[in-house]
């Protein structure tokens, strides 16, 4: 058996580790190469269980050892809401806390935060598992809240959460501009600043929201002031429920998601794959 090296990034675990702003760059695996995926992070509150459930992930009952790990973890961190707990092939136990993944031993004598990298395959195991746990049924997304734009026949569908002031979202817009045969559903998610809320309202209240959004994101032409009953609160609540922790966040028809700007080739592959499967 090939030896495998597990790379762990240590992190302090605190009770209120769900409030931070800023920019981040994380590494994703694609076709055997490392692609840098950029996103603007805004960590929201953990999703509640109220309302419609969008996750398609089914959790199996834990075995006695895993159940004991959960109980020990909860005993040591009584103020945290624990999600999925399960063993890994690497001799560790994976513990989901909101949108983060932590690792511990069977005695919960130490806790470390991912990402966990499989050195043999160079896969980001943490990212893969979080994507599975955060799977969202595309057909259940409330697309009536989104700005719909059809390019070509619109065969490929994608839903995107964007902040109007997100630089990486603008970069993604330029990538999508070069693509055809795609239907884009944009959920405006104003989380970066009060001005983001104003711009989101102005876009949503415009006569042609898609045209105004592109003018701002692609050309830097700010939307004209507009007033209406824009569903800002509903959009923010939706993003929190779906654990959208940064912009842009992309949702595909195969119920997977991606955080950040994907390289053009990888984005095309994801769109094509979703239709063929």
Curated annotation (Swiss-Prot):
This is Probable thiol:disulfide interchange protein DsbC. It is found in: Periplasm. Keywords: Disulfide bond, Periplasm, Redox-active center, Signal. Its main location: periplasm. Residues 1-19 form the signal peptide. SUPFAM superfamilies: DsbC/DsbG N-terminal domain-like, Thioredoxin-like. The keyword Disulfide bond applies. Pfam families: DsbC_N, Thioredoxin_2. Disulfide bonds join 166-169, 205-228.
